[in-house]
From Swiss-Prot:
Entry note: cofactor: Binds 1 zinc ion per subunit.
Lineage: Eukaryota, Fungi, Dikarya, Ascomycota, Pezizomycotina
Name recorded for this polypeptide: Inactive metallocarboxypeptidase ECM14
Native source organism of the sequence: Paracoccidioides brasiliensis (strain Pb18)
Keyword Disulfide bond: yes
Disulfides per UniProt: C334-C357
Amino acid sequence: MRLFSHLAVLAILACAVPITAIPSFLSNSYPAHPAEGISLFPQTQPQAPLGLWTRLRNTVIERLWRVPPQLCKNRPGHKGKFPLFSAPASLRARYGDDVVLRFTIRNAEEVKALAEASNILFLDVWASTDEWVDIRLSKDVVPSLLGLLPKSLQTSHIPLIHDLPQTIYESYPSSSQRSSYDVQGFSPSTKHSSDKTNIFFQDYQPFSVIVPWMRLLTSMFSSHVQMINIGSTFEGRDIPALQIGVWPANNPKPRKTVVVSGGSHAREWISVSTVNYVAYSLITNYAKSKHVAELLQQFDFIFIPTLNPDGYIYTWEVDRIWRKNRQDTSLPFCPGVDLDRTWGFKWDGNITADNPCSESYPGEDPFAGIEAKQFSQWAKNQTAQNNTEFVAFIDLHSYSQQIRYPYSYSCQPDPPNLENLEELAIGIAKAIRLTNRETYEVSSACEGLMASQAKVKSDDPFPRIERTGGSALDWFYHDLNVKYSYQIKLRDRGSYGFLLPRENIVPTGQEMFNAVMVLGRFLSGHDGFGPLDWEDESQRPKADEDDIPSENELDENDDSWIPYDYRNHDDQNEGEGYDNDEWGFRRRRKR
């Protein structure tokens, strides 16, 4: 049976063109008729004749799924104009004419059709919410995809990224910035650094820079920082982490510990930078902020910039959009396991275990992903042998700006401490919004990965676009009994997707630093969320004077730009500012 599955995968791959992704800077829109869909992406010259495999693929789709021929074949006579590309030829060769489309979903039939078509064509689903789904694919595949979808979806989509190679090219650090790094070096200061001085967060950093930076922090702040190793990767690299806290001597009680992890999916660079930013902010503010000092005296914080160093390095050196780790699978040309689908709790790999080419491939068995297994063993050893009590787990991802709590595998049953999970999640969302005005939606993880029929007043959920069993979120919550476990999807909402510009690194880091402060104050029991120390420059949003409205421009009820003091929270009406202030909180529809 396994051999038959592999042969089936090989046959389908032989009939499919390589699938890449969508970037865009064009202002085109799809025509109303689905047969004209491909003309959305204009060209400077007539298209070259279709290759043998592309024509074979189109023929297979036409025959098996009865797709009209005009939807499966490019029209070589079509002419248009293409913008000039500055991306290197190597990027153009790898990503070709890949695009990212956003489909608006309205009912269960549309979701099911989109999920089935994505599986048939081996498409890369970038993100999904209860309103839309972003899919990366080659322009050659667009007609085939539309032909597999109902008519309602053939016209309810827009292009998000038209030119993936160019967008990828612009996401890498510029040569001028790299030269400035070589001259100035990375020197954390005991005083709060300006953006110009703290150049580490002016751009994304490769793994070869992150590790020495972590060592430097450890040597400079040895009183409250240690560098530890979580385990080893498939390719033999260490998985480094920073342990931050003030360890009391001869304390028999278990040490309460918060884990913040990023980079499980290699292409989500903003999660790596954000973990580093939050760690750096706690480290450098220990001697300046009494609230930070209190937290580090009560809790240990473990910051893991990337659980997937092999994959992260691969995104820098080979494929910027790579998602999985780099371990071998049963198919030599389809390496990698999805490190957020391979955990042991409610692992549902029986559905996708025979397809190593899937972006969500969970491996052949629970904990088949080496890095996830190493992480779980480290966590168990900490609780069993090192007097550690894990009280919170935050798993940073991108994108879509969502705060998700358990469970991911299913919306039934509810987690036992649902109300507390929701309360803290709302507080985190509020802290984020009051930092830089960004809105994060709060929901259970199962709802965040499917569409809901709230708009049509039904309690029945839509089918899922992606399988969600075997997540780190559920494992930490259920198997390790970490009561406050969250998965946070960072910026943005799809304009750039995984290729978020470097200008978002510091603002996103500020938002998550304040989120961690709220988490810590909540766990400390300081009157709910406790006060945020807005006197610390690291917690205040850095807005230009032109961005701050004058008094006559401010609505007396609009405090979104003003640093929020949680000490005054009890003076407000209970619940004020949550649902009424449109913070994106969606309560569970079924209790």
